[in-house]
Every structure is written in C-alpha cells, then in structure tokens.
Swiss-Prot record:
Binding, Mg(2+) 1: E231, E267, D295, D338
Cofactor(s) recorded in Swiss-Prot or TrEMBL: Mg(2+)
E.C. number: 5.3.1.5
Entry annotated with the keyword Lipid metabolism: no
UniProt-annotated catalytic positions: H100, D103
Organism expressing this protein natively: Rhodopirellula baltica (strain DSM 10527 / NCIMB 13988 / SH1)
Gene name for this UniProt entry: xylA
GO biological process: D-xylose metabolic process
Family recorded in the similarity comment: Belongs to the xylose isomerase family.
Catalytic activity from the UniProt record: alpha-D-xylose = alpha-D-xylulofuranose
The protein's name in its UniProt record: Xylose isomerase
Length: 439
C-alpha cells in the first residue's frame, strides 16, 4: 500500500512549469561538461531528518504527521518505515540514500540485541535496494545520542565507551558493506570538550586516531573498499569539536598518517558555524586532495545554530558547483540532503516540496557554474590577476630559484614594486549575476 498516493514519480517539466510536483531544472539525463546531471549530483536523501525527524524542538513536542509510523521503537515499525522510505526515494528519482545505524533500527536491551535489530532491518533495506535500484551512499554509526557517549565515543575518558563504540562501528561497517555502501562517514558530535580543565586533549586526539586506524584495518579485513569520510563541524552539541573545519581535519589526518584513507564530507551549515563559506571549505578540501562528498543544506545567518534548512539559493548552489567542478567532481560521494523541513511544514507532502526545491536549486547551480566555466571570463580574470607569477621574478620564486638575498638584490635594483591592480570584486559579483540571469 502506497504511503504517498497523490504523489507521482517526479519528472522534469522545464523552467516554465508551474507544477509544484515537477522538476524545473533537474533533468537527470541532461549532459553538462560531459556528464549527466544525475552523475554530477549523485543526489542522496538522508534517513534521519526525513524519516526520524518529528519537528520537536526544546520548546515543544513533534508536529510531523507520519501516518505510516506508529511512534514505537519496534523492529516491525522500523521495517515498515524502510518500505515507505524507498517509495519516497524512487518518486524523487534519488539514486542514493544515507543512514545512521540508529536511524534505521532501534537500540536493543544489550549490544547483541541491537546488532540483531540492525540485521533485521537491513534485510528489508537490501530487499528494497534490489527492487528499486536505489543505492546506499554511506552509512555511519550514531555515537552521540545515547547517554553513554556523554564524554565522547573514541575520545571518551571511559575506556569501556571506546570499546562499545568500536563494536558499534564494526557492525555498522559490516552492514554498510552488505548494502553496497560506497562510503562510510565519521561525524564526531561528542568528540571534543566542554572545558579544558578536565580534558587531556593530547590523549583524546591519540585515541581518536587509534580508533580511525582500527576502522581502516577492519574495513580491509572484511573487504570493504568504500571511501572513509570525516564530516567537519566546530561545535554543537560539543562546545569545541576536534573536527572543527576542513583545515583542522586535514591537519589531523596528516599528523596521524590517515590522509591516504580519509577524505572530507563538507556540510554547508557546518562551514557557516566554523566562520567559513561553503566555497572556502570546498576549495580548501579540494586543494588538499580531501574533497569526498557534501551534505547539502543551508543555515540561517541570523541564528547561531545548525538549522539544516533545504538549499534554495542559486548563489550558494552556483558557488558550490563551481568548486566541485573545479576540483574534478566528488567521486564516490554525492550531494546528500542533510536537511529537514521546518516544524511548521508537518505534512508528508512537504517532504517532496523540500527535496524538489533543493534538487532544482543544485541543478540550476550546476548549469550556471558550467556556463561561467565555458565562457572563461572568471578564469581569465583570475589568471591575469596572478600574471606577475608567470614570468620574471614571480616564476623564479615559484621554481625555488631565489631566496631572500636575491629578492633584496632584485628590489634594490628595481627601486619599488609595480603598481597593484584593482581586485574588481564588485565587477565580478555583477558578472556572476549575469550568468544567473541568463541560464
């Protein structure tokens, strides 16, 4: 029995369509820069916000109307929920989905029962994947909700908690492999500290690295060849998280000899909380060879927390796709909608409106970014801005042919620097508007 009887499979109808249950910009088979939109985006829908979010907040209970969910933490309810999830995935033409272990299956009375619960729901997930063709983008373990993780998981001061976390990730890796997951994500929501008075940061970082090495070793032992990803976030729920931004993560990975095994899953709202733009985080990760996937959402600049709103801003999606195209795409990663409908958007149909809007925004962002790249206008401006490095003293500096003594001699002879040129920021911002207008 269908959970969404009034919703057809969402189709592309073009920019002039007034149908709210149609794509205006996302045409899966349209080829952009030699790849289809579907292959550029690899759209993914998250299980947690979409099927476990209730609309609850600190000031009131949930508002979401979900007729298929009886509200129980039973395996049977979880299995029923899984069938409904795949109806939504297929009607949105989303090729991927993503989960935390506790999203898809309830925690049991003990670890053995918890594992059995996950296996029972994985049976249904596997059946649904085979029936629909929808694939698992990535799995991960929820090591932040249960009170046992109050001090962290891999960074906990309690060695038993580290051990429990290891057992949980072991199982999550096994199920991710079973379901053909193409990546595995670590997000350290509790991996950090509230106060340094009671914290041995060095020991915690060492433990975190040891945990990741254990994950790499176990993945090899079971033949899981998916990409490991770390998702940066500076705070919330912890005051200071160790995976605070792309730079901190890449430094950590290099310091502990993990950089050949891990890339980054960059989220827009997390970049905002870290005081960065999404463009910055993507460019930095790409420069360092660490761009693996993205969590697509947006935050509210007037609020100081992770609001996980659906992305509908063409400037944001254009900037995001400019960086993804610049760095050669996202490989086995995807554009994963880690976003939730607002508390006031409580009806099932709102799930479709939200995802259609996000998918369309990214599709148009891709087209705009491709148009900017095809014209060469932005690239030529940047190249010309750095032209003094292409010859003369600039080329010698980059080639390592001169040191401070030679630089001093050069300037003593020259007398003063050549005049600087304008950065033309306003011109470039207006230029980007031109492409947004024309696509």
């Amino acid at each position: 029995m269908t959970a969404f009887p009034d919703v057809p499979v969402i189709q592309y109808e073009g920019p002039q369509s007034d149908n709210p249950l149609a794509f205006r910009w996302y045409n899966p088979d349209e080829v952009i820069e030699g790849k289809t939109m579907k292959d550029h985006m690899r759209f993914s829908i998250v299980y947690w916000h979409t099927f476990r979010g209730t609309g609850a907040d600190p000031f009131g209970p949930g508002t979401a109307v979900r007729p298929w969910d009886n509200g129980s933490e039973s395996v049977e309810n979880a299995q029923k929920r899984a069938v409904v999830a795949f109806e939504l995935f297929t009607k949105l033409q989303a090729p991927y989905y993503a989960w935390h272990d506790r999203d898809v299956a309830p925690e049991g009375a003990n670890l053995r029962e918890t594992h059995a619960n996950l296996d029972a729901v994985a049976d249904v997930l596997e059946e649904q994947q085979k029936a629909t063709g929808v694939k698992l983008l990535w799995g991960t373990a929820n090591m932040f909700s249960n009170p046992r993780f109050m001090h962290g998981a891999a960074t906990s001061c309690n060695a038993d908690v580290f051990a429990y976390a290891g057992a949980q990730v072991k199982k999550a890796l096994e199920v991710t492999k079973r379901l053909g997951g193409e990546n595995y994500v670590f997000w350290g929501g509790r991996e950090g500290y509230q106060n340094l008075y009671n914290t041995d940061m060095k020991r915690e970082l060492d433990h975190l690295a040891k945990f990741f090495h254990m994950a790499v070793d176990y993945a090899k032992s079971i033949g899981f060849d998916g990409q490991f990803l770390i998702e940066p976030k500076p705070k919330e729920p912890t005051k200071h998280q160790y995976d605070s931004d792309a730079a901190a993560c890449m430094n950590f990975l290099r310091a502990y000899d993990l950089d050949s095994h891990f890339k980054l899953n960059i989220e827009t709202n997390h970049a905002t909380l870290a005081g960065h733009t999404m463009m910055h985080e993507l460019d930095y990760a790409g420069i360092q060879g660490g761009l693996g996937s993205i969590d697509a959402n947006t935050g509210d600049l007037l609020l100081g927390w992770d609001t996980d709103q659906f992305p509908t801003d063409y400037y944001l999606t254009t900037q995001t796709m400019l960086m993804i195209l610049k760095h050669g795409g996202i490989g086995t990663g995807g554009v994963n909608f880690d976003a939730k409908v607002r508390r006031e958007s409580f009806e099932p149909i709102d799930l479709f409106h939200a995802h259609i809007g996000g998918m369309d925004a990214f599709a148009k962002g891709l087209k705009i970014a491709a148009a900017i790249r095809a014209s060469g206008e932005l690239a030529d401006f940047v190249k010309n801005r750095y032209s003094t490095w292409d010859s003369g003293i600039g080329a010698k500096i980059e080639a390592g042919e001169v040191g401070f003594a030679e630089l001093e001699a050069y300037m003593l002879e020259k007398g003063d620097v050549d005049a600087n040129q304008s950065g033309r920021q306003e011109y470039l911002e207006h230029m980007i508007n031109k492409y947004i207008d024309r696509v």
